Structure formats: structure tokens, C-alpha cells
Design a protein with these regions (language model features):
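Structured beta-strand-rich core segments of catalytic domains in phosphoester-bond hydrolases
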Residues: 1-66
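Extracytoplasmic/secreted cell-surface and envelope-processing proteins
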Residues: 7, 67-70, 108-111
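Glycine-rich, phosphate-binding/catalytic loops in enzymes
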Residues: 10-13, 76-77, 116-120
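Loop/turn elements at helix/coil->beta-strand transitions in domains of secreted/extracellular proteins
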Residues: 54-56, 94-97
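Catalytic metal-binding/acid-base residues of hydrolase active sites
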Residues: 62-64, 104-107
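A long, amphipathic alpha-helix that forms part
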Residues: 69-94
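Metal-dependent phosphoester-hydrolase catalytic domains
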Residues: 91-93, 106-228
Length: 228
């Protein structure tokens, strides 16, 4: 709680007034924003749904980690629960605008992100593409995951999290922190502002080896911007 209070005090010094949105029921997630017309949706231990200006659905997530055992299937089930909750809000508000953002704790190519039963977040999607696909007679809405564009070593950093384990399968760099958006949000996204943050006003966020500095955070933060 001390860290949250310190962050809150630092945010108060920003030029823009930021409000701590209501995430009661989701102690793992805290959200600040400059929008006042914000109504909380479903609050769960692992996600917080917020309705902004009665037309934008934003869901902050902090999903199951693999540090204490693999939880691939559990994350798929949680992603399915999140999308089910969002679907009902979309129907009620008659909107298609959705942003899912946060620590998904798996990379874009893994089950919860790509599975049609999960986020169904594809690496390529255009505004004119068909917005869904049918699997065994059931229709699944497509989402878009722009984080694929930041993956790999063409530009530092290669991901948001670094971990080496004695396993045959270990990419070392992982893109655990992501933003996933609905098809309707694609033209509103400012592509140049999708970034992995490695520096802040107080200095760099990485070690001498250029890995995330766990004394600050074991994950690099991300940022994105939308014209709304």
C-alpha cells in the first residue's frame, strides 16, 4: 500500500489531473485516468472492467503466472470469462470499442492470447477484414494484438520480461505485458505511440545487462495511445 500511496502522490504532481478509478474487488490492479465519466464493470481478483464515457470498455488484467507451475489452461478459462463479461457490456451499451491491457503473463503466441476461446487476439487484422471466424459451427469475434510488432531484437527491448530457466523450451525474452483491442479501435490507435518503456524521469529501468531491473520491476511497462 505504501508504494501505491507514493505513486498516487507522484501522479498528483503531473500537469494533468488523474483520478484513481474504482477497482474495489480487484486488489491486484489500480487504474488512474483523466476521464471522469467512468463506471466500474465486473471486478475480479484478476481483472477490472471499466466503462469510459459510456462507449469505451477498458479491462485491466493481471493474470495467472507460471512461476509456481504452468497455468496455460487456467489463463484460457480466465480470458474466456473476461470476454464473456465484455460481451454483455457491449450488448448493453451498443458499442464495439474494447481495450484489454495489462500483465497477461504469457506471450502473444500462447493459448489464452490466440485461442478463439480466449482473447482470439490476432497478429494482423484490418478494419475492413471480416470481424469473426467460425469454428465447429460457433462464431468467435476477432481481436487485434499489436504487440507482435514489438517482438524480437530488431529494436530494444525484445520483450517486457526476461527469465532464463533450465528447460528445453525457453525463449528467455517474453512479451507478457500487452494491449489487445477490438477491430473498431484499430483506426483510433496511434501506432507510433505503442512502446515498451525502459526509461523514466528518475532514470533507466534496466540493469547493466539491459534486463528489467527487478529492484524497480521485473517487467518493463508499456504505453499506447488512441485518438478518442
Amino acid at each position: 500500500m505504501a508504494e501505491i500511496n507514493e505513486l498516487n502522490d507522484n501522479l498528483k504532481q503531473c500537469k494533468k489531473r488523474l483520478f484513481n478509478w474504482n477497482t474495489k474487488g480487484c486488489e491486484r490492479i489500480h487504474i488512474w485516468g483523466n476521464y471522469i465519466d467512468v463506471t466500474p464493470g465486473e471486478q475480479n481478483k484478476y481483472f477490472s472492467v471499466q466503462i469510459v464515457n459510456k462507449q469505451y470498455i477498458m479491462c485491466g488484467v493481471h493474470m495467472y503466472s507460471n512461476l509456481n507451475g504452468e497455468h496455460y489452461d487456467e489463463r484460457v478459462a480466465l480470458a474466456e470469462e473476461i470476454m464473456y463479461s465484455i460481451k454483455h457490456i457491449k450488448q448493453r451499451l451498443q458499442t464495439e470499442h474494447v481495450i484489454v491491457i495489462g500483465d497477461i503473463n504469457e506471450s502473444p503466441y500462447e493459448k489464452a492470447c490466440l485461442s478463439a476461446k480466449g482473447f482470439h487476439a490476432l497478429p494482423a487484422l484490418q478494419i475492413l477484414d471480416k470481424g469473426s471466424r467460425t469454428v465447429y459451427g460457433k462464431e468467435y469475434e476477432k481481436m487485434y494484438n499489436p504487440m507482435w510488432n514489438l517482438f524480437g531484437d530488431f529494436k530494444y527491448p525484445p520483450g517486457t520480461y526476461y527469465r532464463v530457466e533450465s528447460k528445453l523450451y525457453n525463449p528467455c525474452w517474453f512479451m507478457l505485458d500487452q494491449v489487445i483491442i477490438s477491430q473498431s479501435m484499430i483506426p483510433l490507435m496511434v501506432k507510433e505511440q505503442l512502446k515498451i518503456i525502459t526509461k523514466c524521469g528518475k532514470g533507466v529501468l534496466y540493469t547493466d545487462n539491459r534486463y528489467p531491473n527487478s529492484n524497480i520491476s521485473d517487467h518493463f511497462p508499456i504505453m499506447c495511445e488512441f485518438n478518442i
